[in-house]
Amino acid sequence: PQPPAASAAAQQTPADETLTVRFLDVGQGDSILLACGDETMLIDGGPVEEGQFLVSRLNRLDVAELTYVVNTHPDEDHCGGLAAVLAKYPAEHVYSSVTEYTTKVFSNVVKYADEQGHPVEVPQTGDSWTLGSASVQVIGPVQTYSDPNNGSLVLRVDYGGTSFLFTGDMEQNAEADLMDSGANVQADVLKVGHHGSPTSSSEAFLEAVAPSIAVISVGEDNDYGHPSADVLARLEALGTTIYRTDTQGEIIITSDGQTLTVTTDPTSREPAAGKDAPFIGNRNSMIVHSANCAKLPGEDNRVYFNTAEEAEEYGYQKHTCIK
């Protein structure tokens, strides 16, 4: 079934409602959770290894179900964690730029969506729906592309007088086509395309968006050199405030329909417990040990917790050393 179309009523924001947009800290990938009223939308799911983290993060944020799951395109660093999410959380609508792709990773997303009885759908450019009192519109892609990056779903979210633009991994030729189409790309907040890659975020496109805030979802010390110094310079030249998940952790932007408030959470992945904490987790295996266990992980792979229950909230499982 098609979701309800966005209407002019979405411009009227209730006094007691806010739109919260969380750019989750999923390393070299994208995952963004939007919540407005009692509805939620997850845009992308980071790489496969982030699936367990995403499930634990949604759990800690008291998310019971997802109204919309949107995969901008089937690259692993955008769809990888969605299978774990869909295996755990009911979703009313699941969207992607395609319904089939050559990878097992994307096939798993399709499988879990099918099992829920909500098969993956490809929304058409121009489609819109409501998220609480916010409106969501698919404004791209405006052409068919052979490159999945350029075929990314491009979403515009408006809440009162505030606006967000989510571009997936759209690159410069698709940016130009989008501008030529006459789409309204101006937005207060831009999710910077392709993790700040120099193949995205042309000067002309950034000038057209004219964001006051730009968010780059990117992995620390990644192999790609993201974000590009050129892209950062272009944003700085516009006076845009830049936030990055690799240096600031989770980025939370809240809108009341008029004003945007930005906070950062460097502890979204790991608590701020000290090294003398009684429980030590293994980042790779997601197993937590008591501090006196003989099988502790190496120093570089340790996460510290004050209680075993806290570790479980972060998605860790207890080792047999914990009774």
Spell out what each predicted region is.
Residues P1-K275, K295, N301:
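Non-globular, low-confidence helical/coil segments that flank catalytic cores
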Residues W129, M286, Y304:
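Residues that recognize and position ribonucleotide moieties
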Residues A273-R283:
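Short N-terminal "domain-start" leader segments
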Residues N282-G298:
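Short aromatic-glycine-(Arg/Gly/Cys) micro-motifs in beta-strand/loop hairpins
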Residues C293-K323:
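Compact, charge-rich alpha-helical regulatory domains located at protein termini
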